[in-house]
Amino acid sequence: DGLPAPYGHTYEGLVCKAGDWQYSTIYADPIAWIRSKHVDYLAPQLYWTNSHSTNPYGPMIDWYSIAAKRFGRHIFGALSITFLEEGNNTSNYDEVIRQVNQTRATTRDNFPGEMFYSSRSMFGPTCSGLDSYLKQKVYQYPASVPAMTWYNAPDLGKVTNVKLSGTTLSWTGKSNS
């Protein structure tokens, strides 16, 4: 594949700078999964901040963006926001904003967004206001579902005549769909 190893990860025998790599510890190979088209997307745990000494966020997001483009699958960065629990203030929130903006700038077509770990950090009492801050700064508009161009989706036509009867939902759609 010619992919260089990302910071914080090893691939095909390259040494990991920090943490561990699932290939050699739990025998999972997510790059093989997207290469072989067995999965539609990956959500790598990109749990480091931009200021991390050996595994800064930027080079990792760039590496996974290259992998997503090369293998034609989506990758959603799983960002940790648990560090916010140590200091609930907007200067710490700005690191999350930087990561979202880096993801958007590095997209290369197949990196359509991010997800956060953990919901306790997002909605818990320690980080009250984070969700509102993100809505104000980077999530002002609804997101569209990214196209999975590798599927040939049928044209299902417009749904009409939607009815709910008890627990049964029915509708009229294009015939033979």
Each language-model region and where it sits:
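Pro/Thr/Ser/Gly-rich low-complexity, intrinsically disordered linker/stalk tracts
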Residues: 128-176
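Aromatic- and acid-rich polysaccharide-binding/catalytic face
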Residues: 20-54
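Solvent-exposed loop/turn segments at secondary-structure junctions
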Residues: 2-6, 47-52, 81-85, 119-123
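Surface-exposed substrate-engagement region within the catalytic domains
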Residues: 50-109
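C-terminal active-site rim and adjoining tail of enzyme catalytic domains
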Residues: 88-147
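Aromatic-lined carbohydrate-recognition surfaces of secreted/lumenal glycan-active proteins
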Residues: 1-26, 72-84
